[in-house]
A protein has these predicted regions:
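N-terminal glycine-/charge-rich "phosphate-binding" loop or analogous flexible N-terminal tail
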Residues: 1-44, 125-141
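Phosphate/diphosphate ligand-binding glycine-rich loop within oxidoreductases
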Residues: 46-118
Length: 141
């Protein structure tokens, strides 16, 4: 799966690279996700986002237009993401709660979510989208 991670710090980059183990084609960018940096998501299927970047309706709409289908958050919460915009765009959203001291575990779970989406599966308990993919197969949405 082609993914992009914005606003990633050097240590997070290292953890993500180790967790990914070259399974997914992940573009890593240290800049924040803004309307000015949105174009880097062109041709990607998934976005990896952290606490620092707010996803408002305009960004979500832009991500959808560029081909993003999945948002994998590694955040303390998801209050920085416009959930109604995500639902309206039909994007899948998963969050792995970011815990200090458990960073490597968090990155492994983010990669596992990418694995599941690449296989057409729901991400289970990490799912934050309003879709009912836990009830019916993901391809029926």
């Amino acid at each position: 799966m082609k993914a992009i991670a914005y606003h990633i710090k050097p240590q997070e980059k290292e953890w993500l690279i180790l967790a990914n183990h070259k399974k997914h084609d992940i573009t890593i960018i240290s800049n924040s996700l803004t309307l000015d940096t949105l174009a880097f998501a062109q041709g990607k299927e998934a976005l990896i986002v952290f606490n620092e970047d707010a996803l408002d309706a305009e960004l979500v709409k832009g991500l959808k237009a560029l081909g993003i289908k999945y948002i994998a958050a590694a955040s303390f919460g998801i209050d920085h993401i416009d959930l109604s915009a995500v639902a309206h765009a039909g994007l899948k959203l998963a969050n792995v709660p970011f815990e200090n001291g458990g960073e490597m575990k968090t990155m492994y779970q983010v990669v596992k979510n990418l694995d599941n989406w690449a296989q057409g599966k729901c991400v289970g308990d990490a799912c934050c989208c309003p879709n009912s993919c836990r009830i019916k197969p993901i391809d029926q949405h």
